[in-house]
Amino acid sequence: MANSNNKTNAQQVRKQNQQSASGQGQFGTEFASETNVQQVRKQNQQSAAGQGQFGTEFASETDAQQVRQQNQSAEQNKQQNS
């Protein structure tokens, strides 16, 4: 049920819509100036490609088969000791 006592200020709504469309809201320019868009795009691209700062360094040092064997041995030792 609509509240008929409050009227919409059409001029204010138009102003807000215009600010939103242009990306210049109340905080738009303050925070946007601190964001390096090119750097963010580069980081997003690296993340999507799986090549983050540490992506290849750690992946190349991990032998999944060896880890599985170590986990299996640890589980067997734990069962024998309990």
From Swiss-Prot:
Residues 69-82 have a biased composition (Low complexity). The keyword NAD does not apply. Transmembrane segments: none annotated. The record marks 30-31, 57-58 as: Cleavage. GO terms for biological process: sporulation resulting in formation of a cellular spore. Disulfide bonds: none annotated. Pfam families: SASP_gamma. InterPro entries: Spore_gamma. Sequence repeats lie at residues 19-45, 46-72. Residues 1-82 are annotated as: Disordered. Belongs to the gamma-type SASP family. SASP are degraded in the first minutes of spore germination and provide amino acids for both new protein synthesis and metabolism. This is Small, acid-soluble spore protein gamma-type.
